[in-house]
Amino acid sequence: MIRTTHFHYPSARDGCSIHALEWAPEGPPRGIVQLVHGISEHIGRYDETARFLAEHGFLVCGGDHLGHGRTVTDGSYGFFAPENGWTLAARDVRALRKLEGAHHPKLPYFLLGHSMGSFLTRTYLILWPGTVSGAVLMGTGQEPAPLVALGKRISALECRRLGPRGVSPLVHTLSLGAYNRRFRPSRTPSDWLSRDPAEVDAFLADPLCQSRPTVSLFRDMMGGLQLIARRDQLARMDPSVPVCFLSGQEDPVGGMGRGVEQVVRMFQDAGCRDLPLHLYPGARHELFHEQNRREVWADLLDWLEDRLPPSGPLDGGTPNG
């Protein structure tokens, strides 16, 4: 029987704590998978995927970012921090990795980031190289540098006009709102997430997914996108760490396949070599909520199992520094 535990741990942002979930398998875990969720959602949406992995022997964990899910206690949805929000969010990912790693120091440890969570995972690989056994980047991409710079500038201007907790219809339309244009005529504003109408409706009905991100979060995320695109920063990664890419062929965040292929090339240029890419025809942004999610789970499980030590955890375990 899978055991699910809710807990909190201190955030890098003073005075805040992060709500987290852990899914423990029935027997001794073979490895750990830490989920890093996307924008305007929460870790509870990954329950089905986490249970699948736990059924196959993995301990799964993940936290609600600042301004997301049950981490929010003051109504500040979609808000990281007044300043340095991206770094704080990345440090919270790192804190959970250290916490879980301390409990299981010899287990292989994997990060799995979706969408904004994939950008945070890429940030993690730069800031703390060699401290995970592997990473999975799902729903990732890379917008052209001039577009990212423009987005950061507009968000910063709106931040000065509205304050860091303000919400700008202009910024939302230019960013997330643009994704649905590719799927006209659309049934809902979120058709770009999945081909499965029931999954789209579940997202729209989820009260923890209804807030719009603040202008400061967009500003911080644009800064994060600039960081993870810089050659000098990519060179800081440990090239021996395997990275798996999962993306829908119809995912606008991944540029309909082109953007995620660009990210693979960026990793190759940084010296990384173990970089399998799975592009799923017809699939949109949220692969774990897509019609072919069982296919995605199977590919993910195969990749994880192929990167486990042949006879259980290595004596030295995974670096916990």
Predicted regions and their residues:
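Catalytic active-site module of serine/aspartate enzymes centered on a nucleophile-bearing elbow/loop
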Residues: 270, 274-321
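Active-site glycine-rich loops that stabilize anionic/oxyanionic intermediates
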Residues: 33, 37-41, 115-116, 249-250
